[in-house]
Amino acid sequence: MNKNGNFKSTVGFVLACVGSAVGMGNIWMFPYRLGQYGGAAFLIPYLIFIALFGLVGLSAEFALGRMAKTGTLGAYAYCWKNKFGKYIGWLPLLGSLGIAIGYSVILGWVFRSIQGVLTNELLTNDIPAFFTNMTQSFSNVPCHFLVLFVTCLLLFTSATNAIEKVNKVLMPAFFILFIILAIRVSLFNGSIEGYKFLFVPKWEYLFNKETWIMAMGQAFFSLSITGSGMIVYGAYLKDDVDIPKASMQTAIFDTIAAMLAALAIMPAVFSFGIDPVSGPSLMFLTLPEVFKQMPLGNFFALFFFISVSFAGITSLINMLEAVCESWQNRFHISRKKAVLVCGIITFIISVCIENGDIVGKWMDVVTIYIIPFAALLGAITIYYILGWKALKQELDKGRKKPVGPTFKFLGKYVYVFLAIIILILGILYNGIG
């Protein structure tokens, strides 16, 4: 049963879910893929998949959490109603913990970059050398510790109250800061080339299977559909909230965040004649080089990394909350003890994988194998083990009009099938998210 209270408002709930969904993938992957796979043409499959996964994927996980009134472990046990059900939820929970461990390392790099900007180290010295030094084994322990200390401190008290308040501040701040960055970047000479890269449609890419594969993977992982994290937020949801509507609002704001990141990043990269890339190199090597060359570069670099830290912290809160809530209920311990134990375990493991190559391999295993399998497990559990009748009853709460047979078809057959495809393609392509 839910021991951590409920979200006080639908706005607070949606912002918390947006906070979970908006993360590194929106910032360092979406802008590059948007340009690389056809510009505006890429948006067609991307928006189709975002709408589909938001409607029937997020809604299903929220509904399961609210119905079971508990998070990952309890929700799977609620559905399966046998001994198997007591253990099956551990895989999605492992995914949440695994991604949190890797995420905390990357957020540690963000915090170290903020420190580097404030101390004038980052932009006045050799940027690749700064990044190399930062990503060595045990080279960033203080900033790494600070990331987990801040996150656990925010989770230490009442779960829903803290999560709601934090996201009501950090998510609007994230959007405001990125809007400011996007406006400033639009004034650069040569920024038009970045807009062309992003938005000039290359319609031939619609006939390229990789465009659809990458759009599907980007949309799926962008919404934090993991069979775990969004279930626990659903457990904190009141019965009068329209879940499908809230799910689509989450998907819309997540897409806006990704577009803002694209508008702030790629025109800046092109205006300074730097080749666009994706992944950590974009955030920690390419963009600092851009900031180094622009007027008031330190100021805008600080803006950027603070914005990224907001997105990262709100995502990490959800990952750790999924674990803490489950441990709190499974082992009958206090919330403070659950948060403390989770924080210590996360820190000990993540410190050992601080090396950039090691954490990269760690994240590959988690995102290519564990998370997609856990998401598939969640989809099957909700649409086939729990069943449509019970799910529909929960989805109809708070709605003026009940969900119809189209929702059932899209969820039970299209969504579950695509979850299988995403798992297979992720392995074949060595990651599509």
List the model feature ranges, each with a label.
Residues 1-29, 57-62, 66-78, 83-87, ...:
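Membrane-interface "cap" regions at the ends of multi-pass membrane proteins
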Residues 2-7, 11, 164, 168-313, ...:
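Membrane-embedded translocation segments of transport machinery
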Residues 2-5, 33-37, 67-91, 104-162, ...:
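Inter-helical loop and helix-membrane interface segments of multi-pass membrane transporters/permeases
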Residues 6, 12-14, 20, 138-142, ...:
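Loop-to-transmembrane helix boundary motifs in multi-pass membrane proteins
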Residues 9-49, 228-234, 241-248, 252-255, ...:
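Transmembrane helix-boundary motif of multi-pass solute transporters/channels
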Residues 29-46, 80, 161-170, 245, ...:
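Transmembrane helix-loop boundary segments of multi-pass membrane transporters
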Residues 74, 107-135, 236-240, 245, ...:
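Helix-loop-helix connectors at the membrane interface of multi-pass transporters/channels
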Residues 88-93, 323, 330-343, 365-427:
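C-terminal membrane-solvent junction of multi-pass transporters and transport-like membrane proteins
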